[in-house]
């Protein structure tokens, strides 16, 4: 593994690196199959490179490039996305390739300045379809923001019908065979990557696919994992993205209120069930869960489908319970949070910090929180349950607009 550069199409060479031993990526992702940092060389009259590698693999990456071209002959370095796993070698490369002009989106320039010490010429992509003349070849650029940083763009090489997408259509999967039609089944890694990296940005993904959907794609040159190679492969993986990028909808014809809570003695659960009953009275269907019974995928699905989300916890040692915080962390993966209404509730003994703390976290996620947190001391009375019911009605009415 990690042997040499590879020719992929008539004018495209892979010059990336494999990191097969990697088991955690960016702190948050398990990478049981390792990953690749894919980078590319365009063999043109004006030679160009697309993306680089993580900094600790810079020597291996540079050795790949030197197999293909003298660095002082490189004319352009296209930077589709500036996250350091794709730009970590860029500063070193610019010093070694003095004639190369870095190419980036307008938004990307801010990240470039924050990551790279460089005061030379740059080429900024201002418009979709903007072209770059490489002599015998031409590149086109399409802005695809928030997939998954604001700077992201795709690069199209018409001559080879190849689209360079960086993190879009990729996955963490290291295999020296490189091409999707040769490495075997990597669908588990492919879906996991989509869920963690791109699912929060479904709306942007649908817009990007519409933007580049007219291109006669035969190759998708991804930033991580197997290169999507051949028209049939492109159709397959494009189809998966079309399916996965659609909004999830609850069964039935009523909008969903999703409620979950952590409750040592059932008192907080009683509040949540009363609030759920109020939401049903207002015209919603409800799904109620003890947080300990929710596996992560189900929690994210429920939150995506819901128009109203209610989160509850007892207060213990001045805080919400750990399973609730762990569940809330997964909300980072939920699309369209700004369009959803949410509220927090909880029973407490003497201090009652849990519900306000949960509400603050919901607000940080940009949920709409039109009601104050609902709190009661210890066992809810009938009046408390009636108040919880009314609270649920009001929140549901807000969610229903």
Give the ranges of each region predicted by the language model.
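Metallo-beta-lactamase
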Residues: 6-10, 104-152, 204-209
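Active-site metal-binding motif and surrounding structural segment of the metallo-beta-lactamase
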Residues: 45, 56-103
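Active-site-proximal loop/helix segment associated with metal-binding centers of metalloenzymes
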Residues: 148, 152, 160, 168-199, ...
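Terminal amphipathic helices with adjacent charged low-complexity linkers/tails
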Residues: 222-254
